[in-house]
């Protein structure tokens, strides 16, 4: 799959507009997601659309919301959601529009990330959607000490300018 460092619009399926993920998206943002290069794809592997459609265990569990074509014109699955559960899959990176600004030594961007206001709006919408989904979960920590121990702020952030990620967290395998 040739979809590395590749920003493209989503090819929405007929299911997208009524999906949980996209149904509350403002129409103007839905149009942006479907027509502007606001989704960064950064992968060599994925699920081909024909494989998804031919595999009952996938197409009976997941609703296909969008597809895309790699540089060679091969169609792949780009957004899915479970029919029944709050399980989602995005082959694109909605988090990067807001937060990844890595540059090469010559000052050029390391990745083809769109940082336009429209791309940032898509990132913010997606983040807010997932926060709202997480709030539906009734799992809680036993106490505030247990919760505090699990926070990301307990781990140092490492600046990694030579990487495509500006910052990284290195977590100990102690949980």
Give a label for each model feature.
Residues 1-175:
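Amide-donor transfer/coupling interface in amidating biosynthetic enzymes
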């Amino acid at each position: 799959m040739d979809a590395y460092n590749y920003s493209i619009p989503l090819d929405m399926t007929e299911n997208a507009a009524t999906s949980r993920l996209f149904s509350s998206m403002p129409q103007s943002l839905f149009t942006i997601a479907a027509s502007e290069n606001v989704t960064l794809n950064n992968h060599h592997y994925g699920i081909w659309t024909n494989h998804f459609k031919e595999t009952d265990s996938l197409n009976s569990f997941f609703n296909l919301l969008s597809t895309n074509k790699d540089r060679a014109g091969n169609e792949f699955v780009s957004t899915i959601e479970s029919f029944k559960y709050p399980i989602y899959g995005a082959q694109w990176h909605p988090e990067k529009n807001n937060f990844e600004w890595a540059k090469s030594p010559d000052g050029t961007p390391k990745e083809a990330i769109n940082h336009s206001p429209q791309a940032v709006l898509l990132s913010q919408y997606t983040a807010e959607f997932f926060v709202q989904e997480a709030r539906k979960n009734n799992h809680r920590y036993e106490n505030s000490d247990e919760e505090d121990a699990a926070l990301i702020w307990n781990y140092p952030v490492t600046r990694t300018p030579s990487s495509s990620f500006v910052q990284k967290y290195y977590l100990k395998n102690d949980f």
